[in-house]
Design a protein with these regions (language model features):
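Catalytic-domain carbohydrate-binding cleft regions of carbohydrate-active enzymes
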Residues: 1-334
């Protein structure tokens, strides 16, 4: 099937989604209608016993002995039944998290065979240990809220630590209707995610970046910086492959001896040289940004900021994101 696609179109990359595996219904879904879900019986939930049967080890595959904090009530909801037995006798419970990984590997193997001279671009929602060697990732279905804008920074940090350096969140938010101000602030930050992409849920209000004048202007400014920094991003990706360091990283990675930055999840370093200090609150006109000791230079004006291991208040008008270059570093850029 993939070969048929690639024989007809020059596809640049692939996005493999819903590969947890995820489903719009629970159970066999035999009718093909999501509303016709298979009933969930109490004994499958561990809350009661079925008639004439006692609980046995099978129930552990439906109700694990530890909390996993899953979104849905039961671990088999909207996915492959965890008691399902594969053709080789393996129970789904034991291999569920490998589904996305194996799909990623199979897809990447095909792309390498089909175009051996090109590094494949693959985006996968489901990942596992080692996925960073195969695919890129986005943080899933977030919400169009100021809280999720803030949380996206820590999420990007997390996956960098997990070994997936090209990662990003849905810019402007996925679920729920965004606002002009939120979308402007999100693209100002999102332009510097390693993987930068806007995305929206079905039936939500349109949120293309050109919908509002202020968002369009914020986008032009932030994306112009990103495109200038593409050689630097590329260098950081290569460095990540060779050394293992994330592309987007918290300040504590570069300044581990400064206790004040241990829990700083409101700023983001791109590599070791570019500091992003976004506005993350509704109605903000300034941001308090932490500057480690040393020289830092405003990206736009080249004005020096003398870091002193303290916060400095920076102006943050709606269409502006604060970007600073670390003194003494070489940053390759393009026009």
């Amino acid at each position: 099937e993939l070969k048929q696609y690639f024989d007809q179109l020059a596809i640049d990359g692939m996005w493999i989604d819903m590969n947890e595996a995820s489903s719009f219904c629970t159970g066999s879904c035999g009718s093909g209608k999501p509303e016709d879900e298979v009933p969930v019986y109490p004994w499958l939930l561990g809350s009661a016993e079925p008639p004439h049967r006692k609980i046995n080890t099978t129930d552990l595959f439906l109700v694990p002995p530890y909390a996993i904090h899953n979104l849905l009530p039961e671990i088999s909801d909207k996915t492959i039944e965890t008691t399902a037995v594969h053709s080789n006798g393996v129970i789904e419970y034991h291999v569920h998290n490998l589904y996305g990984y194996m799909e990623s590997k199979a897809t990447r193997d095909f792309l390498l065979q089909h175009r051996p001279d090109e590094r494949p671009f693959l985006l996968s929602r489901s990942t596992f240990s080692g996925s960073g060697a195969l695919v890129n990732h986005w943080t899933g279905d977030n919400a169009a809220t100021w809280q999720d804008l803030h949380l996206s920074i820590a999420s990007v940090f997390d996956f960098g630590i997990f070994g997936i350096p090209m990662v990003g969140a849905d810019i402007c938010g996925f679920n729920g209707n965004t606002t002009e101000e939120l979308c402007a602030r999100w693209i100002e930050l999102g332009a510097f995610y390693p993987f930068s992409r806007g995305h929206n849920a079905i039936d939500m209000l349109p949120q293309e970046l050109y919908r509002w004048d202020s968002v369009a202007e914020a986008s032009r400014r932030a994306l112009a910086v990103r495109y200038s920094l593409l050689p630097y991003f590329y260098t950081m990706y290569q460095h990540s492959v060779e050394v293992g360091w994330p592309v987007a990283r918290p300040l504590v990675f570069e300044f581990p001896s400064i206790s004040a930055v241990v829990d700083n999840d409101r700023q983001m370093l791109v590599g070791d040289s570019i500091l992003i200090s976004p506005a993350l609150q509704k109605g903000a006109v300034s941001v308090d940004a932490f500057f480690p000791s040393g020289r830092w230079y405003d990206w736009y004006t080249y004005v020096e900021v003398a870091g002193s291991d303290a916060n400095i208040t920076l102006d943050a008008p709606l269409e502006h994101v604060n970007v600073h270059i670390r003194g003494g570093k070489i940053v390759p850029i393009q026009p």
